[in-house]
């Protein structure tokens, strides 16, 4: 156990355009090498593309996509005796959002569209409809937890 105090959680300021804290946090996930202006351009560009294609509030679609990606349970490795078990555990809300954002950005980067804004828009729309690589990742994690349900008594 660390002997130092736990670092205080820093509040993320709301994003300037939509006034959403979760969107500001998402921009930080998109950001590479501290280039926040580039990340903002990518995210706002993606939301504009979503608005063009769906003719509805892009922030609602973004939140719907995050809900579709966020896992409810995951597995953690637990060593008992000489064996390592994959123990299913519930995911706390802050980690749910963090995982959802990470998966969304990772799978958007792997897509084939030309610009990152287009890739992100495509992944957002797919996730909001319950398809796409990020949603598949969530289903895989849930399937893994279901398969290892027998070890759930090895709680942390």
Swiss-Prot record:
Naming one, the record's GO cellular component terms include:
small ribosomal subunit
Q: Which GO biological-process labels does this protein carry?
A: translation
Q: What is this protein called?
A: Small ribosomal subunit protein uS7
Q: Which HAMAP family does this one have?
A: Ribosomal_uS7_B
Self-association or partners: how does it assemble?
Answer: Part of the 30S ribosomal subunit. Contacts proteins S9 and S11.
What this protein is reported to do is described as: One of the primary rRNA binding proteins, it binds directly to 16S rRNA where it nucleates assembly of the head domain of the 30S subunit. Is located at the subunit interface close to the decoding center, probably blocks exit of the E-site tRNA.
Keyword check for rRNA-binding, yes or no: yes
The GO terms describing molecular function are:
rRNA binding; structural constituent of ribosome; tRNA binding
Which SUPFAM superfamilies does this one have? Ribosomal protein S7
